[in-house]
């Protein structure tokens, strides 16, 4: 039986329900760190199930940075207006705006990158590798690796999270899905910077 103090501590750290905290502590013999990991795995598994669900509610959130020199707007969607009004959802929208202001991504995910941009990037990489005397299959592997790096620079969901670079932006969205119990999607975003060329 999990001790109430441990349940309270785990609940404060994770925001999980009492029954989930109790289950996690019993499954990990009262080890708080393992219980947190247990809940994250369970939450992410639940989040994966919610990913395909339709999102028609949400908010438009804006953020102004550096004394008005950088501005970001995002449309963040969820399944119900109840979740859209929660502080956790609004905080996620703000975190995503901060990330966009900081990293200037061009696309939400790799699926949004136009094929002609991918081909252009491959051409640039091939040009950089043309003097290497490597077999074509090795060159293709190098191109794949460099394309992965490209996606990590230009796709919001693949960027390292600004508050914890061991995690990606997609991870904080999955955490929010697990916590709020609804699918969450980024519909679109735009970043403005004073003096920026279009």
State the predicted function of each range.
Residues 2-198:
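N-terminal assembly/interaction segments in proteins that build large macromolecular machines
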């Amino acid at each position: 039986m999990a001790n109430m103090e441990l349940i309270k501590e785990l609940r404060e750290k994770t925001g999980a329900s009492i029954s989930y905290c109790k289950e996690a502590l019993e499954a990990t013999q009262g080890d708080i760190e393992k219980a947190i990991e247990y809940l994250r795995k369970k939450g992410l598994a639940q989040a994966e199930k919610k990913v395909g669900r339709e999102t028609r509610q949400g908010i438009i959130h804006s953020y102004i940075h550096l004394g008005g020199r950088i501005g970001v707007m995002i449309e963040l969607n969820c399944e119900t207006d109840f979740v859209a009004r929660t502080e956790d959802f609004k905080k996620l929208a703000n975190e995503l705006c901060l990330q966009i202001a900081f990293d200037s991504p061009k696309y939400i995910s790799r699926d949004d990158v136009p094929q002609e941009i991918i081909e252009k990037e491959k051409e640039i990489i091939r040009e950089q590798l043309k003097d290497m005397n490597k077999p074509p299959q090795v060159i293709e592997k190098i191109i794949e690796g460099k394309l992965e790096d490209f996606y990590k620079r230009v796709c919001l969901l693949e960027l390292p999270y600004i508050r914890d670079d061991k995690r990606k932006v997609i991870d904080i969205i999955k955490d929010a899905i697990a916590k709020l119990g609804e699918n969450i999607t980024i519909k679109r975003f735009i970043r403005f910077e004073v003096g920026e060329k279009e």
